[in-house]
Design a protein with these regions (language model features):
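Conserved helix-turn-beta segment immediately C-terminal to the redox Cys motif
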Residues: 87-88, 105-128
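Thiol-/selenol-based redox modules, centered on thioredoxin-like
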Residues: 179-226
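Thiol-based oxidoreductase modules, predominantly thioredoxin-like and allied folds used
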Residues: 121-136, 151-160
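Extracytoplasmic/secreted envelope proteins and their assembly/folding machinery
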Residues: 103-113, 138, 142, 159, ...
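Short extracytoplasmic
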Residues: 51-87
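Short, internal strand/loop/helix patches
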Residues: 142-188
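Short active-site neighborhood of thiol/selenol oxidoreductases, capturing the structured segment around
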Residues: 79-105, 109
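N-terminal targeting signals for export/organelle localization
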Residues: 1-66, 224-226
Length: 226
């Protein structure tokens, strides 16, 4: 008889149970290590300020408290500073007649938004603030932002209220007359990040890159202490 088979047959029930328990423990240990590795892989990578800047994100040394304001949401309802509470908001200033920068930015923001996991998307808002309130009425803004993503939101309102809000976020915009009698609007291309306390927290420089935005956004969220 083969020696190995003979040795196996000679093992007592207690020895066989011991071997089985050892195998089970080793398998469970391997599964635990694998689960820990996969969980770590899913965690955001914390990066330095220098890395943030190299990837297009500038985090304010101290988040800026915003003055109270009231704008008009694309739903037609009033929108106040309090609406930012409890959520992360990425705010871009643009307008529906913008020929290139705005649609490109909105499409990029949609690509970025789609890369986020479901839990992160749940408390992340993408908001377009109009710099052309004369033409961007709520219903028009509503259709425009939802063309890019049904979860996106739009804000418009009185010109001076929009201007004050933009100034607080260091986003310039100016009406520019055209030769044909019409006008366009020059505006900043950065995307501003407002934290769950409703404070100006950071901004993303143009040109935007969805992968870099995801990296920096997740790091900023992970280091936010409220």
């Amino acid at each position: 008889m083969d020696k190995t088979v003979a040795d196996t047959q000679q093992k007592t029930p207690e020895q066989q149970r011991g071997i089985l328990i050892t195998v089970v423990v080793l398998v469970l240990l391997m599964l635990a290590v694998l689960a820990g590795f996969l969980n770590k892989m899913g965690q955001p990578r914390i990066i330095t300020d220098a890395e943030l800047q190299a990837n297009g994100a500038i985090e304010l040394e101290r988040p800026r408290i915003l003055d109270s304001f009231t704008l008009l949401a694309d739903s037609g309802e009033d929108f106040s500073t309090d609406e930012f509470a409890g959520r992360w908001s990425l705010v871009f200033f643009g307008f529906t007649h913008c020929p290139d920068i705005c649609p490109t930015t909105m499409a990029t923001l949609n690509n970025f938004y789609q890369t986020l996991d479901e839990e992160t998307r749940a408390d992340t808002d993408i908001v377009l603030v109009s710099v052309d309130p004369k033409r961007d009425r709520p219903e028009k803004l509503h259709d425009y932002v939802r063309y890019f993503n049904p979860d996106f939101r739009g804000l418009t309102g009185e010109f001076l209220a929009l201007k004050r809000f933009a100034n607080q976020l260091n986003v310039p915009f100016n009406k520019v007359p055209l030769e044909d009698g019409g006008y366009t609007v020059d505006h900043g291309s950065q995307v501003v990040l407002i934290n769950p306390r409703g404070h100006y927290h950071a901004f993303f420089r143009a040109p935007l890159d969805p992968a870099k935005m995801k990296l920096t956004y997740r790091s900023i969220r992970a280091t936010y202490n409220g």
